[in-house]
Amino acid sequence: MSQYKTIAESNSFIVLDKFTKYFEVNEAPAIYQTEAALEKEFIQDLINQGYENPTNLNTLEAMLANVRVQIQSLNNVEFLDGEWTRFVEEYLDKPSDNLVEKTRKIHDNYIYDFVFDDGHIQNIYLVDKINITRNKIQVISQFEQTGTNANRYDVTILVNGLPLVQVELKKRGVAI
């Protein structure tokens, strides 16, 4: 086993002077790598870094249910079904919001004052920007999106259940 020198360390992370990819240690080197193999390697690297890899998130309904679980966990709250529907319609996936307004929710307006059915008001966070380790990071593959444009992304990274990064992988040597 190689010896590594620590460059920086905190309670949340560690930076070492050298990084060896999982596949380099555990697999024979491949001369030709398919796009599927590249995707598998990328996902495994993310899993090795602590990302969860739920395999049941293949429909819009499953994604929305996952967002609910993650938002409830982040905010230490339990939504009733009616409250969750209202939260989604009033704020999270407001029908009148365009792409820019939805993006602003993550960057600027990521805290929403939600009034629960019993009358109490609570700040609901989409992401925790102060203590980032509280955010749940997940990676899924081959999620199909329908709508005005039907897309299927190779890898999608979810932050608290929200699809914030979509990656389209290409095998080496192929012009894009």
Language model features: what each stretch is:
Residues 1-176:
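An alpha-helical interface "stripe"
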